Design a protein with these regions (language model features):
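Catalytic core of DAGKc-family lipid kinases
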Residues: 1-105, 111, 118
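ATP/nucleoside-binding phosphotransfer catalytic cores, i.e., glycine-rich phosphate-binding loops
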Residues: 92, 126-141
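Short helix/loop capping segments that flank catalytic or ligand/cofactor-binding pockets
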Residues: 107-109, 134-135
């Protein structure tokens, strides 16, 4: 977990064993015991969209939190999701909407500016069905 003012991550060198992943879904689907290089997606964006290091190049290895979300459905069944960046339930513009977020970003939108992918916390945004469209648009930006 990060602490204000402390260095986050450790200097390392890219090896042949490191695997490049192309986004948040790809990142979440990989085993946790291998080193991954995130090339795109919301996690990469929250890390400043780093350049893919060449084999043998120096880089920083950073741990990130993972989200495991269990969703209970109306029919009594449940769904379990593993994600690296966010899980969204519902629709931004109508009805109830819940977003559990790790990176702070959804695309180019920084919906949780204080989020950090290794702070041990997940940011939650909840929009109630009674919210008007204008309020939802403001919450989205």
């Amino acid at each position: 977990m990060i602490t204000r003012g402390e260095q986050w991550g450790v200097p390392t060198t890219r090896t042949h064993a490191d695997i490049v992943v192309n986004g948040d879904r790809d990142l979440a689907s990989r085993p946790k015991d291998i080193r991954l290089i995130v090339k795109a997606g919301d996690i990469a964006h929250s890390l400043g969209d780093p350049v893919n290091p060449l084999i043998g190049a120096e880089c920083i290895e950073v741990p990130i939190d993972a989200l495991r979300v269990n969703i209970s459905l109306r029919d009594g069944s449940s769904v379990s999701l593993l994600a690296s960046s966010h899980v969204m339930i519902g629709h931004w513009l109508r009805g109830r909407f819940i977003c559990v977020n790790n990176s702070g970003f959804i695309g180019k939108r920084n919906i949780s500016p204080r989020a950090h992918p290794n702070d041990g916390f997940f940011d939650v945004m909840s929009l109630q069905p009674s919210m008007r469209l204008q309020q939802r648009v403001l919450a989205r930006h």
